[in-house]
A protein has these predicted regions:
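Helix-loop boundary and gating motifs at the non-cytosolic
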Residues: 7-70, 236-241, 245-263, 270
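C-terminal ends and interior cores of transmembrane alpha-helices
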Residues: 95-113, 306-319
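Juxtamembrane intracellular "pre-TM" segments in multi-pass secondary transporters
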Residues: 3-18, 204-237
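C-terminal transmembrane helical hairpin of 12-TM major facilitator-type secondary transporters
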Residues: 298-342
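Helix-to-loop junctions at the C-terminal end of transmembrane segments
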Residues: 71-88, 176, 283-297, 382
């Protein structure tokens, strides 16, 4: 609800669609590529492993704690909606969040190389980035609805994610063999580059009021959305399936130790392997885009769960540079085909009227499964109980395949039909 003192948005000249798409595209890129888990995954993990001499489970716990803000991303959305910053609902958060994120990135260059100090700085960095990411996502939804640009913006996000995956490997590998200050500077420059884009292209008018009535309305909507979600059997069924699929003991961090300590891979080659996985993911996404119009979701889910378990078994032959390159590329392709049906299910299961909040809530629960449970559990078994890398592969594959037992819980109507048939209906 607009207050009487606030200027009407209708009196302002409409913003250019091209300019808004520029802001959205830049925002997606900087909050993705500039996230420490992308550009800084190798440099940070190898710093903790080789300089601070930490075990795999402590490295996994580091990432679990430091990415805490991403688990409660829906909360950031409600805060942004309820409390404008510098008289705007978007622009202020994007500018302030990017500036703070750039500053926190630079702090890594001077902060003492200790576990607690690194966790503290990365935690506040992630908080700043979550607010930027949340506002950019809200802007994407708003522009999609206002201009009928859902397809273009969805394609933009997918394309940029592909570019990020391709760049993250070689850039992360290059940074991992240089002084850590280069990583801090690189992350800072990525985040700070968003400031001139927002300042130049986003012409959101000032005057959004901070009033208790608006905040009360936003939190009332939040309670209503939560009530709708709690009553949705489809929503909780899909959320449970997502959680269980990603709950299997993971080996992301143990694989880094295995690559360095057993296979003696150079960090730059490890970055190259990430790039191959990114290429496979892009190809897999393109293939699923065609298959989802021809194959019912139930079939895709069953095949996806089996593919997820099967592609994991590729890593049993992860024994040389050549096999690693082939396996990472193939696993990226097959793994994407395996997981995209889960996101299709998540989108279908979200109750009408709470699409953005419901979907982000499911993704937050997925993140908890990956970062708080799966990777730390696998790393704990690897470090403390001396479970070998290949034993972890078997454990992960078996746990993933067992999720098939959960499928009968999902409503039949949710799994019926292809994407095209649902759209037609």
């Amino acid at each position: 609800m607009r207050s009487a003192e606030a200027p009407s948005d209708d009196s302002q000249p409409p913003q250019s669609l091209r300019a808004l798409i520029g802001v959205i595209g830049a925002g997606i890129f900087v909050t993705g590529f500039g996230w420490p888990g992308i550009i800084g995954r190798l440099p940070f993990s190898l710093l903790l492993k080789n300089q601070l001499h930490m075990s795999a489970d402590r490295v996994a716990v580091f990432w679990a704690i430091a990415t805490l803000a991403w688990y409660v991303k829906p909360l950031a959305g409600f805060i942004c909606d309820a409390y404008p910053l510098f008289g705007t609902r978007r622009r202020g958060y994007m500018l302030a969040g990017s500036a703070l994120a750039g500053l926190f990135w630079l702090t890594f260059a001077v902060v003492p190389r200790g576990y607690a100090s690194l966790v503290a700085v990365m935690t506040v960095l992630n908080i700043a980035m979550v607010f930027v990411s949340t506002v950019v996502g809200g802007l994407q939804v708003e522009v999609s609805q206002r201009y009928g640009a859902t397809g273009r913006l969805a394609s933009l996000r997918t394309g940029l994610e592909g570019v990020m995956n391709l760049l993250a490997g070689p850039v992360g590998g290059w940074l991992a063999v240089r002084a850590f200050g280069w990583t801090a500077l690189s992350g800072s420059l990525v985040m700070l580059s968003f400031i001139p884009v927002v300042a130049w292209l986003d012409r959101e008018p000032r005057g959004a009021p901070v009033n208790r009535q608006r905040a009360s309305e936003v939190w009332s909507i939040a309670r209503s959305h939560l009530g709708t979600i709690v009553r949705s059997r489809s929503m909780w069924g899909a959320t449970g399936l997502l959680f269980l699929v990603y709950l299997a003991p993971g080996f992301q961090t143990p694989m880094l130790y295995y690559q360095q300590d057993v296979l003696k891979f150079d960090p730059r080659f490890m970055g190259f392997l990430q790039t191959l996985g990114g290429v496979g993911s892009i190809v897999g996404a393109a293939l699923y885009g065609a298959l989802c119009r021809k194959v019912p979701l139930r079939t895709s889910l069953i095949a996806g769960i089996l593919l997820n378990a099967g592609s994991t078994l590729f890593y049993l032959r992860y024994e040389s540079a050549t096999s690693a390159a082939l396996i990472d590329g193939a696993a990226g392709l097959v793994g994407t085909l395996a997981t995209l049906p889960l996101y299709d299910l998540a989108a279908r299961a979200t109750p009408p009227g709470v699409e953005s909040f419901g979907f982000s809530l499911m993704m937050s629960i997925r993140n908890v499964a990956i970062f708080v449970i799966s990777d730390p559990l696998g790393s704990y078994l690897y470090s403390r109980h001396h479970v070998g890398f290949k034993q972890l592969v078997w454990l992960n594959a078996g746990s993933s395949a067992a999720v098939l037992l959960f499928l009968p819980v999902l409503p039949r109507a949710l799994l019926a039909g292809r994407e095209q048939s649902r759209a037609a209906g």
